[in-house]
Amino acid sequence: MNSNLILDQAAMPLIMGICCLLPAEQVGELVTVIAEEEGRLGVMSFTEAEGTPHGIELRRLTRLALHIDRHRLDRTVLPIYQGREQLMAGAAALLDEDMTLACGDAMRLLALQLDKLLRGGRGSAQAKLDGLTLSVMEQRALAAQSPNTGAVVRGSWRRKSRNQLGRGNWLDVVEAALWCFWHSDTLQDGEALLGALLGADIRVRVVYGMLAGAFYLAD
């Protein structure tokens, strides 16, 4: 494996955001995932992956970050509607056995929001809100299947209190990560909120890391 290629991937905003939130021993695991993905993308299933549940989820979300970087809408040669669907469908496909309606919606929504943050403005609450808010056309493209998804799309993470958040499924995970991201002004502030909230859940931690990386580290 070309070490320069791995370093290039590790410098991506989403990957950098994840790295900032991981303990040192898991950063090495992340680099291993990048190497595997560049060498044999799509070959390993998560059910075959060795390691702890934390390791499996880190692998899944690292693959999501790599997928979004490859298929960003400002880099695709596809028509916008096809590029958007490619972005969302590829994200949802990473769920494997976890594919419920709400979980599929969560991954599709997260892919859209990360892409918008990467391509959007910086430095203000309005820029952050613009990156997280779907247009009418984007909501139609999302085509949410779960009745619970609409509240998250409309910004439940702006209004809920800390004790109203959960982590029961992927939609809850995305909502909790969005809450930490919205209620903080720096990556470090969000990390502090994360620790007080659901910091032990690797899924919330890594999703927040991607959101923060897309907004704070993209430049």
Say what each PLM segment does.
Residues 1-219:
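Structured, active/binding-site neighborhoods that engage oxygen-rich ligands
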